[in-house]
Amino acid sequence: MKTSRLSTVPTSSSSTSTSSSPSSSSGSGSSTNTVGSRLFTQTKVDNSPLDFENEKELQKKLDDIVSEFRNKDKEWTFRLKALQILQRIINGNGIEFKGWSSMLRSISPALIEQLTELRSTIVKEACASVSLLGFRMKSKFEPFALQYTQALIRMVPVKTTIISESAHQTLKDILESVSTKNLLQTFLDASLDQHNEQLRKRCSEYIYIVLSRAIENDGMILVSSVPALEKSIQKLLIDGASETRQMARYCFWAYSELNEKSATLFYTHFTPTTQKNLFTVQEHLKGDQLEFCEKLKNSLFEEEQHQKMVEDSNDLDFDLNDFKKDNNNNNNNDNNNNNNTSTTRSKTPTTGRASGLKIRSSTNTTPTTTTTTTTTTTPNKTQSSSSTSLRSGSSIGNRTEVSSSIKRPLDASNIIRSKSSLGTTRKDVITGGSGGGGGGGMSTSSQSPISKTPTTMITKTASSSSPNLATSTQSGRYSSIGTRAITTSLSKQSSSSNLTRSLPPIIKSPISPPGPTPPAPTLTKSKSTPSSPLSTPTPSKLSSSTNTTTSTSTTTTSTTPTRRISSSTTSSPIGSTTTSALKRPSTLTSTPKSSSSSSSSSSSATLSSTKTPSTTATNSTTSSATKKSFITKTNPTDEQTTTPKSITKTTTTTTTANSTSTSSIKRRSDNVDEIDIESLEISLNQDNKLAFNEISDEISNNLRDAKKGLSFYEKELTLDDLENNNNNNSNSNSNSNSNNNSKRSSVSSFTNSIKESTTADVDFNWLEDSVHDSLIDDDVLDFDENNNSTYIPRNNNNNNNNNNIIKEQQEQQEGEQQEERQQEQILDEDDELMF
């Protein structure tokens, strides 16, 4: 793009012409007086250059011009004449002096004031002077170009045409005259102005001039300005003004000539519309820009063709299920031969939601219908005579469950339709000795092998003018609106078998081998919440159904409030206790065991109760009632036997069930051995007290050592004394119960099981449990005279050792202090001698 300069630039010394302005040749109201004639036509002005002999005369003349610029009291014509004189000085030999740069720096502020003047004539002459400076000084004007550019860029968006056009032309002259590396950033910032369309349009021209000069000359654009340049071009390409967008396209192709690689990447950031519009200026491009444009266009065309081929290949979507249809059909035929009652779906046109269309088949039936269906099922095939399917008037879809091994199409003429719009379910109802589920809202077809027997179901006739009264086997949401079909009641045997099949698997009880006592199951006691007076056992742990199963359970009944055994097991305020089911051991025992081994888990529970000091209150020997545990004896039979001698259920007892519990005890008294739990509790409480005393002594010793700052190794806890005490207690208990041999043997075996559990679980975690602060103090803890007497000497020895260590440390400190005092005395004596 070629830029035109102002005609005020002199070409020779005799440049004064006698051409008159159009206004002088024509009247003042002539239409030929245009802006272009006023800008680019010369009036009768003396533009002859002024030459000076020395710098003093030049300095004096410039001072006079500056004084005229700053004198605002006089008319504006004096400033106009001063500007014309400045133009003559610039055309002269004044710019050749060495001090011209400093002189120009002194007059620049005054000249910039004239550029921002409100009077258009003054601004036009000032712009002509600045253009002349750039043309004459070339690169020497570069230090001054930035400050003049910043002043001129503010005059570009002015609405006065003479001012804006003069400033615009002056800026283009400066860009053509000097290096633009320091000026580009000013135009880039102005091009992003969102409020001034005229300024964005002018800045796009300035950017194009800078890019054009950068193509011809090096060093016109700084590398640091490239990101801002790309951002500016991208914004200008989508500007609201068409002229601005057009100039921005030229800027892009000029930028592509500078850096082809960056321009290609920059091109991908544009929208498809912007990319397409970039090629609208292809006809006006020349040289390398045109070559790059054609190359980019060809590459885009190839990419488009490749993308089209990819899309065509994606349209060829093969469904692998089509290739597997034959295999699926073969598999279905094999399954039908193996299972004669397998359900197959008839091939019917898709309706309802599956197809999106409401298809209704034509029916040839009359409003009054009498339907008789006879279905005969044989082991090989199923034959149906006068088969009539019932379907409601729904367009939602059809769900078919036909018990047949032969596929046959659905006869639309035999379909009876109701007014319901809820859908339909077609199926053959088969009743037998042990058929499908009974007594439900929706009938389900059974696929069990029992249905192989020939069965016949004759539906009742229904005569009505409405199809809703036709016989139907549907119920629930798929039933007709008018009436529902009368379903035949199942037999007692089929109901029992269905109920048995629907229940979860039953936990079978262990079979006890022959011996004095059966294998002892684990008895666990659960807490009953006060909110529910009766708690029922879960079906997964105990069997309370009507099925005939074998189970061995332990029932604990109580007619009076139970005495609390330990703090871990508490009774409900209402007085109801719940016993859970007995757990079956993994393997059957080959040797008989004593009945006292059934309390292994109970003993572990009572051992855990020793962690809290509240168990000391459980030593009372009197109770309101005696607790008794009843264990049912069963003879050894096969696991598949279904008739045990006794079947017991776990029950929840309340305070009002006195007579019931008493009668149940009498009925089971023949096969039950009684165990006195009180004797067991006494022995357990004594053992627990011994263990608690031993652990408490160890804790108190550790706390004393910690207070005195001494660390001892953690001592492992041994329960040898506990075992000896257990033996003594068991002997005393056996002597006290000499009249009852069975009781004595059960108690001794029970204590033996306690010793086994205690020796196995040596690793206690007593420190994690809570201990009353009142039991831990500096005094010796005397829980028992006999048990804790052995620990007092140990504590005394520890105290003596600690006192000895403290005394030795104090003596050492006193000795060190005496030595320091002696040294201080010696130093004081030396100081006195010196003085």
UniProtKB/Swiss-Prot annotation:
Looking up SUPFAM superfamilies in the UniProt record yields:
ARM repeat (SSF48371)
* Low complexity bias (residue ranges): 7-37, 328-351, 361-395, 489-510, 522-629, 641-664, 724-750
Record field: transmembrane: none
What residue spans carry the Pro residues bias annotation? 511-521
Identify one Gene Ontology CC term for this UniProt entry.
spindle
Locate the compositionally biased regions of type Acidic residues: 826-835
Which GO MF terms does the UniProt record name? microtubule binding
Query: What residue spans carry the Gly residues bias annotation?
Result: 432-442
Please give the superkingdom of this protein's source.
Eukaryota
Q: Which Gene3D superfamilies does its entry note?
A: Leucine-rich Repeat Variant
Which residue ranges does the record annotate as region Disordered? Answer: 1-38, 317-477, 489-668, 721-750, 810-835
**Compositional bias (Polar residues) spans?**
396-406, 415-424, 449-477, 631-640
GO aspect biological process, one term = microtubule cytoskeleton organization
Q: What is this protein called?
A: Uncharacterized protein DDB_G0280205
